[in-house]
Amino acid sequence: IAGLLDHAGELFDCSAAEETTLEANPDDLTPEYLAALRRAGIDRLSIGVQSFDDACLKLMNRRHDAAQALQAVRSAQAEGYGNITVDLIFGVPGFGGDSLRRTLDTALGLNVQHISAYHLTIEPDTAFGRRAARGEFAPVNEAVSEAEYALVHETLTGAGFEHYEVSNFALPGFRARHNASYWHGAKYLGIGPAAHSFDGRERHWNVSSVEDYLAGAAAETETLTDRDRFNEYVMTRLRTAEGIGLAETE
């Protein structure tokens, strides 16, 4: 990771970079790895906790358990990370109500600066999706989804977090800078297999195969019309607390 960041600094002017985020699973964040990441220049961690309920984690086939998730956050804080976000999942069949409330309370008790809460999506061609197709569990209905989303919103905003985007909550001053760029139509460069980029007019996405990517396979490209860009502006900005600026649509 240090080599990648150093090479990026050789190719691009990164002097204005205000935040360098790394996403990781809890079971990967050993004290040694956390220290190495700090030395490499990582100053923000996004930790894929998903839940602090072991039964819920088992249902979702996660490698880690709740104890590992807690330890990952505490180890990161001990290493000096002062900008940590945890990803949580709601809408998991059988794990709303008290289970979700305990997960939210546990996350708040860790004094992290940012929390992302996403509704579970069951993809058909996954192990989880195949289990649902066999009738092992059923997706939650719309009423349950709404109730759980309301619980997430009320709990986190009640604790002082800003609900600044559909799925994202931050303490003042800790909004995710890279995500905000996507929602506001900024340009970005994606490097690696399956990575997406946007140059202001065209979207590019790399092949997903590592072998094909290393062999130099060309990225696919979509050129956006003015109508496409307007529609994307509306859709992405409606995800944010700021909403749409009418002057910007003219």
Predicted feature residues:
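C-terminal scaffold of the Radical SAM
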Residues: 1-250
